[in-house]
C-alpha cells in the first residue's frame, strides 16, 4: 500500500472524477437543505482547486448544474466515484491571510464581510480544523481527554462531538473507527473510506486519506508554506511570491450586482443569496411582503383556506381584518354563503335530494364521504364489532361512542332545582354549584338571574334573536356554540346511540333517553300547578309559561311577544313573507311545515 509521507511526491494525475460524488434522485431527496448546501460547497471548491493548479481543462456537467442552482442528480451517474467525506476533518481549507509572506507586495486582503456573515456547515468544520499551538497533537500523543468517560482524542472537534453523546446532542459515530460526525451524510461518506484502500497518510497527525489531492489540501492546515499551488503558478507572475500568485488566480469571481470579488465560486454563490432575499412580493390585501412561496401560504390565510378546529373563531377574526363578502346566494330563501360548496349543501335542504347513490343497494346519501363509509359494508372492509351487542361500526370513532351506551348502566340522577339529569353523583355535585352560588347578573327583560356575565350574555340572545354561530354545511345559525356542535352531528350522520326496541338511532345519549320514554310511557316532568306531566323538561317550561303568562320572545318589528322561540320565528315570516317550505310537485310554498304537510295530502289523494 503506497503511502505519501514527508516530501514524497507522486506523478499520478488527479482528475475531477477522483473527487466527484454522484447521487441518484432518490438519494438526493433524502438529503436535508444544509446537507445539499454542504455538498454544493465542497464540489465547487474541489473543482476550482483543480482549475487553479491546472489539473482540470473541461467544465463537468455537474459543475454547470450546481452553478445554475439545478439538482445535480440530473447528471448521468455512470461515472460514480468515491470522494472525500463531507463535513469531516479533511475538507478543503484556504490559507489564512495572517500567514501571508509580508515581504512581497501587499496583495492579501481581509476576508469579505459578506463571506463572514454567511455561516455554513463547512465553515464550522474548517474553524475547528485550525492547527493548535500545542505540538503534542503531532507527536502521536492524545492530549485531549473527555471528563465524563476518560477517552482521549487528537482534535478538539472530535472531543466536542464525542461529548455530544453524554449531553444528548445529536451526533453520528462511525462503528469502525469511532469518529463522530454532526450529519448523517458526513458519516455515510466517511464510511466509504473503510471500504477502499487507504493509500495516503499524513506524516504529522496520522490521518489517512484515499485521495492524493485530499491529503495535499489537508497538509495546508499544518503548514501554510507547503502550498501545492506554487509549482504551477510561480511562473505566471515572476514579481510575486508563489503564495501571492494564489490570490491573484483565485480572486476572479466577481458579483455583477455589487462588484464584490471572491476567491471561490461557492462564496460568490452564497453572497448572491443576499440579493435574492430582497426580491419580495407584496400581498395586495394586507400589504405584507414575502418571497415567492411564503406569499402563497399567506394568501391562503387571508382568503380563509386554512383548516382549524375553531372555525367560528377564525371566521370572526377574518371579518374584523377584511371585509367579508358572500357572493353565493340561494334563489329560494335568499341566504348567502362565502363558498359555493356551502351553497350546494344548503340547496339540498330545499330539494331533499341525495346525489350520491350506492350501486349495490340503491341507498342514497347526501355526502360523498358517507357513501364511501357505507360501501365498506359491501366490500367487507375492516369493521368494528361490539362484543356485547354484536353491533358493527364502520368507523373507530362510532365504535367508541357506541361502547359508551353499555357503560351507561347507572340510573340517571335528577337535579331537584332544575330537573336536569346526570349520569353520576360527581357530575351532579359539580352542577349544584350553579344553584348555590350568588347570581348578581339579572336579565332586564325576563328578570332571570345568573351567576356569571357570560351566562347572562348567552341568555340575552334569546330576546335579541342573535345567532352568531352558523353551520357551514347548511347555513343554519345558533345562539350557542354547544348547539352548533350538536347540530353538526346531523351532517356527519354519526348516530351511535340506538334504541333496542325500535332500532332508531340518535347522535346523543340524552336524545336516546328521551326517546325511550315513548316506549315506557314515563313522564318525569310534572307541572306543580295543574299536575300535568311531560316527557321532556322543555315541554314543561313552555307549559308553565301558560300559567305565568311569561312571553320572553318579542318581535322587533311589531313588538308582539311569544312564549317560545319557534312561535316568534313563525311570526317573523309574516313580516318578511318568507316561505321556506315548498312543494316538490307543484312548487307552492308555505311558511309552516304543517301547512306543507296538509297540502301534500291533496297530491296523495289524487294519486289514489
UniProtKB/Swiss-Prot annotation:
UniProt cross-references to InterPro entries, sorted A to Z: KRAB, KRAB_dom_sf, Krueppel_C2H2_ZnFinger, Znf_C2H2_sf, Znf_C2H2_type
GO MF annotation: an example: DNA-binding transcription factor activity
Compositionally biased tracts (Basic residues): 124-143
Cellular-component GO terms for this entry: nucleus
GO biological process terms on file: regulation of transcription by RNA polymerase II
Domain KRAB: 14-85
Entry keyword annotation includes Metal-binding: yes
SUPFAM superfamilies: beta-beta-alpha zinc fingers, KRAB domain (Kruppel-associated box)
Location of the region described as Disordered in the Swiss-Prot/TrEMBL record: 75-143
Compositional bias (Basic and acidic residues): 83-94
Subcellular location: Nucleus
ZnF (C2H2-type) residues: 144-166, 172-194, 200-222, 253-275, 328-350, 356-378, 384-406, 413-435, 441-463, 469-491, 497-519, 525-547, 553-575, 581-603
UniProt KW keywords: DNA-binding, Metal-binding, Nucleus, Repeat, Transcription, Transcription regulation, Zinc, Zinc-finger
Family statement: Belongs to the krueppel C2H2-type zinc-finger protein family.
Stated role: May be involved in transcriptional regulation.
Name of the protein this chain belongs to: Zinc finger protein 667
